[in-house]
Amino acid sequence: MSSEEVRHRAESSEARAAAVSDIQELMRRKEEIEAQIKANYDVLESQKGIGMNEPLVDCEGYPRADVDLYQVRTARHNIICLQNDHKALMKQVEEALHQLHARDKEKQARDMAEAREEAMNRRLASDSPALPKAFARVNSISPGSPASIAGLQVDDEIVEFGSVNTQNFQSLQNVGTVVQHSEGKPLNVMVIRRGEKHQLRLTPTRWAGKGLLGCNITPLQR
């Protein structure tokens, strides 16, 4: 495992730990709000069991004398405000859980890609030691992108990209055409990384960033 991969794994673990901590804090606040709502309902219960909607005037239209009107009004107001806070907080919890699940799914996909890469690399190790010529180099990768999930790294030299190889490569438009026609379909990508061949599976996919890959490549001088 390269130092870049180790760093990326460490950052992912730290990000997940921070997300879990945020969710725990949200749940603590949720319990506090629910306790406050219950306390205010207890106040209403202590006032002749009056609820949120019972009238505060008697049949003749006068303020009821059998309950503490100030306490009732205050408790009702507090309950409404706390219920609004609770609703907003639950939306935050839902979003945080969604992000955590998405992060876990991305990690699982990355781990599977790394396992496939390792297996392919072991098979490639028994092939001819002569390295094929590359036609392009990766100079940037966005975190969480399809390229990142597939295991592509900065400075990887591309030997094959789907049907594009050194023999038929003319310009980056060749790669762009393959990508546009392969959305959602896995492509075989062979790269040279620190003197070794690596076989990857890259699936062009729409994601949060630009394009279908989330990486930038530049052609090599031929």
Curated annotation (Swiss-Prot):
Domain of life where this protein originates: Eukaryota
SMART domains reported in the protein's UniProt record: PDZ
UniProt-listed SUPFAM superfamilies: PDZ domain-like
Domain PDZ residues, every copy: 108-194
Keyword Transferase found: no
GO biological process: negative regulation of insulin secretion; positive regulation of DNA-templated transcription; positive regulation of insulin secretion; positive regulation of transcription by RNA polymerase II; proteasome regulatory particle assembly; type B pancreatic cell apoptotic process
A single GO molecular function term of this UniProt record: transcription coactivator activity
Coiled coil segments of this chain: none
Residue numbers of Phosphoserine PTMs: S128
InterPro entries: Nas2_N, PDZ, PDZ_6, PDZ_sf, PSMD9
GO CC entries: cytoplasm; nucleus; proteasome regulatory particle, base subcomplex
Keywords (A to Z) from UniProt: Chaperone, Phosphoprotein
Cited function: Acts as a chaperone during the assembly of the 26S proteasome, specifically of the base subcomplex of the PA700/19S regulatory complex (RC). During the base subcomplex assembly is part of an intermediate PSMD9:PSMC6:PSMC3 module, also known as modulator trimer complex; PSMD9 is released during the further base assembly process.
Subunit-structure text: Interacts with PSMC3. Part of a transient complex (modulator) containing PSMD9, PSMC6 and PSMC3 formed during the assembly of the 26S proteasome.
Family: Belongs to the proteasome subunit p27 family.
Protein name (database record): 26S proteasome non-ATPase regulatory subunit 9
Lineage: Eukaryota, Metazoa, Chordata, Craniata, Vertebrata
Gene that this sequence comes from: Psmd9
